[in-house]
């Protein structure tokens, strides 16, 4: 309106059109401009309305523009009111649903694991006091009270669980320091010195960009993890030492956060006991109780003396009445001569006659064979060739020594 010094219906319509256009755009930066224009229009209009000329068309146009602005303004107001109401209802309903869910099934009791709910607050305290996980008497009583209250909120499924006591919590921390590996790190990397262990834990947490527990005394020592490890080990730090410390640390944190199933079923011990010995038929299966889970040390049975039986030895001069298996004896030229000489006449008399049997009917094959099949499936090595070879005519006419002839008959 300030751009139009002479107030008229035409300038009034143009001002309303600008307000309508900027109002429908609904930009954040246009809101102060709209407020300023509306205030100026409201201030100047009552003073100049009486001096305006009568123009029904322009007046009708002013009424239409004003009506559109009014309808749009009411719509925006309803939208804002509805949004505020819906937002409030959504926040209220969500809060009620979360409270109901927390009351019926808390996060710590959603899984039926023995270490989850009862040990939740104890594990949390262990992590917060990792540099010195030795709770005071006041802290123990507070943890016991907090744990029992959490257990009572679980519901009927845990109603038969007895309340936790202070001495049980003390035993849990003793076992937790050992099972998690905290005591192992204390012994291996801190010389079993709790002050060194405290400084080592703080250096590790500081190197991992984690918050360290508050300290009552100011530490003037170095917070560099490698320097602390090297000082505790008493020698230069090696990559193997650093890797072992990192592995032990990761294993400790994993146990504290997630833990393991601390209760092993009795069936495991029964299975181990049954696999050690074979039960007799008709005997009942032994059931391993708590008292029998650690059997007494077994003593090694005395070794039975070995029976010393003399192994039969082959004699170079066996007799005819020997009962030993002759197939196990090594045949030598002397043995062959003796054995064949003893049995040659009996074999010759019971089977064939010397005049009707030619042992060399196959030519020289028998002389080329390394062994000769004798009676009783006993193999006898053939005699080695002598230095003096037999003449061909002697072999063909059967003129060979008597000993060789005996070998063929046996």
UniProtKB/Swiss-Prot annotation:
Biased composition range(s): Polar residues: 312-335
Motif (Nuclear localization signal): 276-308
Keyword flag S-adenosyl-L-methionine: no
GO cellular component term, pick one: nucleus
Segments of this protein annotated with the region Not essential for B2 function: 333-410
DNA-binding segment(s): 107-184
Keyword terms, alphabetized: DNA-binding, Homeobox, Nucleus
Pfam family, one: Homeobox_KN
Function description: The B locus has at least 25 alleles, and any combination of two different B alleles yields a multimeric regulatory protein, that activates genes responsible for the pathogenicity and for the sexual development of the fungus within the corn plant.
Record GO biological process: regulation of DNA-templated transcription
Keyword DNA-binding: yes
Protein name as annotated: Mating-type locus allele B2 protein
Sample GO molecular function, one term: DNA binding
Region Highly conserved between B alleles, residue ranges: 111-410
Principal location listed in the UniProt entry: nucleus
Cell location: Nucleus
Bias kind Basic residues: ranges: 291-307, 375-388
Biased segments, Low complexity type: 205-233
UniProt region (Variable domain between B alleles), positions on chain: 1-110
Residue ranges of the region described as Disordered: 201-239, 278-335, 374-395
Similarity annotation: Belongs to the TALE/M-ATYP homeobox family.
Alphabetical list of InterPro entries matching this protein: HD, Homeodomain-like_sf, KN_HD, Ustilago_mating
């Amino acid at each position: 309106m300030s751009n139009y010094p002479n107030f008229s219906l035409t300038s009034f319509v143009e001002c309303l059109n600008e307000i309508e256009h900027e109002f429908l755009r609904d930009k954040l930066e246009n809101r102060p401009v709209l407020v300023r224009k509306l205030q100026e229009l409201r201030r100047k209009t009552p003073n100049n309305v009486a001096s305006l000329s009568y123009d029904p068309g322009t007046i009708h146009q002013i009424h239409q523009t004003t009506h559109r602005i009014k309808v749009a303004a009411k719509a925006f107001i309803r939208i804002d009111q509805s949004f505020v109401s819906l937002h409030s209802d959504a926040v209220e309903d969500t809060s009620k649903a979360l409270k109901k869910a927390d009351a019926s099934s808390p996060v710590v009791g959603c899984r039926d694991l023995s270490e989850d709910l009862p040990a939740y607050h104890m594990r949390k305290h262990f992590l917060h006091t990792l540099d010195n996980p030795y709770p005071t008497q006041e802290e123990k009583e507070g943890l016991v009270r907090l744990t029992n209250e959490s257990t009572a909120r679980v519901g009927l499924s845990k109603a038969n669980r007895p309340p936790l006591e202070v001495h049980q919590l003390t035993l849990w921390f003793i076992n937790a320091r050992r099972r998690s590996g905290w005591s192992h790190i204390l012994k291996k990397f801190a010389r079993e010195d709790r002050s060194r262990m405290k400084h080592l834990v703080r250096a590790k947490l500081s190197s991992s960009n984690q918050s360290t527990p508050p300290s009552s005394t100011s530490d003037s020592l170095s917070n560099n993890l490698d320097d602390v490890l090297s000082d505790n080990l008493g020698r230069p730090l090696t990559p193997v030492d650093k890797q072992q410390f990192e592995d032990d640390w990761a294993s400790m944190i994993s146990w504290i956060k997630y833990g393991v199933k601390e209760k092993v079923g009795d069936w495991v011990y029964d299975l181990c006991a049954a696999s050690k010995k074979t039960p007799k038929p008709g005997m009942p299966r032994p059931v391993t109780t708590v008292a029998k889970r650690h059997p007494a040390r077994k003593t090694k049975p005395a070794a039975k003396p070995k029976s010393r039986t003399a192994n039969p030895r082959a004699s170079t001069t066996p007799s005819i009445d020997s009962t030993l298996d002759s197939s196990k004896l090594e045949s030598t030229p002397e043995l062959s001569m003796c054995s064949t000489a003893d049995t040659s006449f009996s074999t010759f008399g019971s089977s064939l006659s010397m005049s009707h049997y030619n042992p060399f009917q196959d030519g020289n094959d028998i002389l080329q064979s390394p062994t000769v099949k004798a009676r009783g499936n006993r193999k006898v090595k053939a005699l080695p060739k002598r230095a003096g070879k037999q003449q061909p005519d002697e072999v063909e006419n059967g003129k060979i020594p008597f000993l060789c002839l005996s070998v063929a008959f046996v």
